[in-house]
Amino acid sequence: MVLIFGGAYQGKLTWAVQQYGLCADELCDLAHGFLPGKRCYYHLEALTRAAEEPVSPSLFPADAVLIAREVGSGVVPVDAADRAWRERHGALLRQLAGQARTVVRIFCGLPQTLKS
């Protein structure tokens, strides 16, 4: 598994497509729902926002490329539902990072490998 994360509009998907040679039919935009059997899943934050319970890392294939937005950056949301989502999303990212063979942070389109 590969985990790619970073802020909004930092070039995460573009970098992943180039780095891993991904085609459009291998991508699943989780903002529009989950499709099994894809090679790359992006917008993990949309999946954790829609879920009422924690998302299990086992939902994704072991060789998947997963792309997630950093949320919060230390800012605590005023709304309780937003705080709960931020906590669910952060917990999922910690679990995925622990299981992933590679973890990359993208900032301004530049990759920073945290784990390989």
Spans of features found by a protein language model:
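Glycine-rich P-loop/Walker A and Walker A-like loops and their local beta1-loop-alpha1 context
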Residues: 1-30
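Flexible, charged surface loops at secondary-structure boundaries
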Residues: 21-22, 33-39, 58-62
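Residues at the C-termini of beta-strands that transition into short coil/loop
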Residues: 31, 45, 107-109
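Histidine (H) residue identity feature
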Residues: 32, 41-43, 89
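A short acidic, often aromatic-flanked loop/helix-cap motif at beta-alpha or helix-coil junctions
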Residues: 32-36, 111-114
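Conserved P-loop NTPase "ATPase switch" module shared by AAA+ and STAND
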Residues: 36-50, 66-68
